[in-house]
Amino acid sequence: MTEHTTSYYAASANAYEPFPTLSESISCDVCVVGGGYTGLSSTLHLAEMGYDVVLLEGARIGFGASGRNGGQLVNSYSRDIDVIEKNYGPDAAKVLGSMMFEGGEIIRERIQRYQIQCDYRPGGLFVALNHKQLETLEEQKANWERYGNTQLELLDASAIRREVDSERYTGALLDRSGGHIHPLNLAIGEADAIRLNGGRVYEQSPVTAIQHTSPAVVSTQHGQVTARYVIVAGNAYLGDKVEPELAKRSMPCGTQVVTTAPLPEEVVRTLIPNNYCVEDCNYLLDYYRLTADNRLLYGGGVVYGARDPDDVERLVMPKLLKTFPQLAGVKIDYRWTGNFLLTLSRMPQFGRLDKNIYYMQGYSGHGVTSTHLAGRLISELLRGDAERFDAFANLPHYPFPGGRSLRIPFTAMGAAYYSLRDRLGV
């Protein structure tokens, strides 16, 4: 059996009744492969609409990125909307821009409707490390307001100093429609909501093959599902055996996270007084927030190719202490790594592998909100309205340069270039 990685989230997860392992042959309307946010959102949307849905998870619900991430509800996509407009044209940007803030709205609605206990707190900060980044945030504010986000505020150096007890930042953009959560508890709550709506969820049921027939047949180690439709939602943890075509268009990447021991109340009150989540504007960014039990959760850096580094704490602690030198000597209780799926365009990849087999993947670090949007869009498609799904599906999906052998060093070289620009402030 494959259990959750040792993390703060796993240690503080809400108790739930485990889901069974698939050990028979069953049939349904829709079979969803993957029990992360993409699969959970898709299954819940469809179950609410009355579909007979089966979700197959190879390990535990939220085992992958959905249960290991920074817990930040970051609006929009990994590519800024002005870049989307430049790359794909104003018509595509208009449609994609109209959906930028929908994923966060879906999450908040789910939390309220199903009373999911996941420590939701509103508000997120994008912090600038130099004047060039602050200018970019000013442009971001204007672009987001153009698409309907009215909950934005620019902060100057003195204002951000009141929000974050660090001397690193020249300013920030506060998005009050952002926020943070306990991501694994959100996943568990959504799985329970699926059960409540009549959906069937199976854990410890890794998919071994998908037959592209009509109906399709999805095989696991001990059972199989015959379904009218299949949704492939494994992302960085799908591997390259089940649907190898998807692996050619994307690359798993690892990010590292540490969580401190609980901090004294007086430290918490000064560190991030309004309990916002924070991410900086570097290409290889740092992100952090406080937890419900007064720990600092801090992540940063990327390992291309999804290798697990030997010493997560050694990689992350210099970043944490550069931001908060006053925490020198703080005890680290948890350290872990998790993989997200990167695309060359930094845009999500949606599409069809066959007339009845669909996929959604590659959120490139912006998956918490975008995955929830994805679930709504696939439910619209199966209901007969493919327009919004196809707004993503029509975007070109480029392979990484260098093929399987050279894509990692080529991508790392590019990241090093942009990191140097960040350090130089250009």
What kind of feature is each model-predicted range?
Residues 1-30:
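Extreme N-terminal leader/targeting segments of oxidoreductases
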Residues 142-143, 168-228:
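Helical element adjacent to the flavin cofactor pocket in flavoenzyme catalytic cores
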Residues 105, 113-121, 207-209, 223-355:
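Active-site substrate-recognition segment that forms the wall
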Residues 68-98:
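Glycine-rich active-site loop/strand segments that organize a redox cofactor
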Residues 48-68:
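Glycine-rich FAD pyrophosphate-binding loop
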Residues 2-12, 79-85, 106-189:
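Flavin (FAD/FMN) cofactor-binding and adjacent substrate-gating region
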Residues 28-55:
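N-terminal Rossmann-like FAD-binding beta1-loop-alpha1 element of flavoenzymes
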Residues 306-308, 313-423:
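C-terminal catalytic lobe of FAD-dependent flavoproteins
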